[in-house]
């Protein structure tokens, strides 16, 4: 049976349920940083305490030596920031201040975390009694007992991000891309080594999945260099924490910044670029960037930043670089604001490698999306692969769909066969199309135009027999319809309404 991405959730849900009692009246973004910050603090304290105990038992007096912890990618936790100190203050009015001070102490001892951790636990809006109750609950949960890998907090962190996304609906796009979508991008691009870049990195999901991919395939995570940025200060800090506990070294800029106006990596030429930019962003400042060097294929319209994001990424590509990104479906066919001409120029430059039409309801928005894969040095020159994946996926809630592992593999395998030159078109699912044929379709990139309609199996029965059966069934339906019509008229007449 296909396994989806919400399987095996137990410990993560336990943490989430415990944290939910904090909701109260505080702002959603503040609540998010409080919950994720508390999870972060508990986990790094657990890891530190385990190593501390081990060093004490060795008896060499190295338990306060920071190098002993750094060598194993464990953050050094000062005495006032250890969970035992937090737990002791759980039922005091000062619990918020104690946690804030703990965060400051951790930042001071671990330069990588400077100005990253949330320090808003003392704010009046946060109910200190409830905060103390959550501390008690966390005290009874030993996170490292659920696994000794840094991935444990990562899973919890990712689960909580998905729950926040569920709560915030369409507003969640700024910090969260569904993991099955990210995994699809990663499985197609296969970023084993080189420079990986996300110009709108949210909470860092693209980087996390890249690291997982490398580890799952026996690669070396140190062979990739991670670069990114995000304009939202809260989201930027979430990404820093997310990557820190995964042990992923990253350059996300010195502060949060607008990618179009303050590119943190102006000289970067990346080998892999993965992104889920804000859908159809308007008011992005186009009038101030009219002659920008990045607009090699045409100036993007002021009312929609889709092709600004796309061209920004193309500008940052290395000579053999590749892009995997999420875009709203309108970008496949739009002719407004010069978008059609930009798309035409990008296609004629032989940059479009593959387009995947994705199923609906993968995101917390009704906007249909596609995956764009572009390459500076395509293996299949003058050809583009179209995949119509709209029928893939499984509903995991009434509103949300996920791609299964098998779905993701099917897309990745199809792409790999295309690159190898062994792919055969499959009606209704995939087709390899020349640039000339795309031009004949006015440079529209909607996969449905090219893959055709799925072939229906013929049961082999004679036409006359089928028609006889179908007309008989239709006659029965007509008879039932007349009977129902008569009953309705009779009941309406009984209450004084004649038809």
Features from the language model and the residues they span:
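Short, contiguous acidic/charged loop-to-helix segments that flank catalytic cores in large enzymes
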Residues: 25, 284-304, 330-339, 358-364, ...
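Active-site lining segments that contact anionic ligands and/or coordinate catalytic metals
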Residues: 269-270, 304-306, 320-322, 326-328, ...
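Hydrophobic alpha-helical scaffolding
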Residues: 124, 146, 200, 228-232, ...
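Non-catalytic, mostly N-terminal accessory regions of nucleic-acid modification and defense proteins
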Residues: 1-192, 251-264, 357-360, 381-390, ...
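Conserved S-adenosyl-L-methionine
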Residues: 171-275, 280-296, 327-330, 338-352, ...
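C-terminal, active-site-flanking charged/polar segments
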Residues: 348-352, 361-413
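A generic secondary-structure signal for well-formed alpha-helical elements
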Residues: 42-55, 164, 214, 218, ...
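Conserved Class I SAM-dependent methyltransferase catalytic core
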Residues: 14, 21, 30-43, 236, ...
């Amino acid at each position: 049976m296909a396994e989806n991405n919400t399987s095996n959730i137990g410990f993560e849900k336990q943490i989430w349920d415990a944290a939910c009692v904090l909701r109260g009246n505080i702002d959603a973004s503040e609540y998010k940083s409080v919950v994720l910050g508390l999870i972060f603090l508990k986990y790094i304290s657990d890891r530190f305490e385990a190593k501390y105990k081990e060093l004490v038992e060795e008896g060499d007096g190295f338990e306060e030596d920071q190098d002993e912890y750094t060598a194993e990618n464990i953050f050094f936790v000062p005495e006032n920031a250890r969970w035992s100190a937090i737990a002791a203050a759980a039922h005091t009015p000062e619990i918020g201040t104690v946690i804030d001070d703990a965060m400051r102490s951790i930042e001071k001892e671990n330069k990588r975390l400077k100005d990253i951790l949330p320090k808003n636990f003392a704010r009046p809006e946060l109910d200190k009694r409830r905060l103390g109750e959550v501390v008690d609950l966390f005290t009874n949960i030993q996170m490292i007992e659920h696994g000794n890998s840094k991935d444990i907090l990562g899973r919890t962190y990712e689960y909580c991000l998905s729950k926040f996304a569920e709560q915030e609906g369409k507003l969640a796009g700024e910090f969260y891309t569904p993991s099955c979508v990210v995994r699809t991008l990663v499985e197609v691009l296969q970023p084993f080594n080189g420079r990986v870049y996300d110009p709108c990195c949210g909470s860092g999901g693209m980087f996390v999945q890249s690291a997982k991919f490398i580890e799952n395939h026996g690669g070396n995570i140190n062979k990739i260099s991670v670069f990114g940025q995000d304009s939202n200060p809260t989201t930027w800090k979430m990404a820093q924490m997310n990557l820190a506990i995964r042990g992923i070294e990253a350059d996300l800029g010195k502060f949060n910044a607008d990618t179009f106006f303050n590119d943190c990596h102006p000289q970067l030429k990346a080998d892999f670029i993965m992104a889920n930019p804000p859908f159809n962003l308007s008011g992005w400042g186009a009038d101030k960037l009219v002659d920008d060097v990045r607009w090699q294929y045409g100036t993007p319209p002021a009312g929609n930043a889709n092709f600004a994001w796309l061209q920004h990424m193309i500008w940052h590509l290395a000579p053999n670089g590749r892009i995997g990104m999420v875009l709203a479906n309108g970008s496949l066919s739009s002719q407004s604001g010069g978008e059609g001409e930009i798309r035409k120029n990008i296609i004629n430059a032989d940059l479009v490698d593959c387009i995947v039409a994705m199923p609906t309801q993968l995101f917390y928005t009704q906007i249909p999306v596609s995956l764009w894969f572009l390459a500076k040095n395509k293996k299949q020159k003058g050809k583009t692969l179209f995949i119509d994946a709209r029928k893939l996926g499984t509903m995991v809630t009434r509103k949300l769909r996920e791609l299964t592992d098998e779905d993701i593999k099917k897309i990745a395998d199809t792409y790999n066969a295309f690159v190898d030159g062994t792919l055969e078109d499959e009606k209704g699912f995939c087709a390899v199309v020349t640039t000339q044929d795309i031009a004949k379709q006015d440079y529209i990139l909607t996969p449905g135009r090219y893959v055709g309609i799925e072939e229906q199996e013929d049961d082999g029965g004679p036409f006359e027999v089928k028609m006889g059966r179908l007309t008989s069934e239709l006659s029965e339906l007509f008879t039932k319809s007349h009977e129902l019509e008569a009953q309705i008229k009779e009941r309406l007449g009984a209450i004084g309404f004649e038809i």
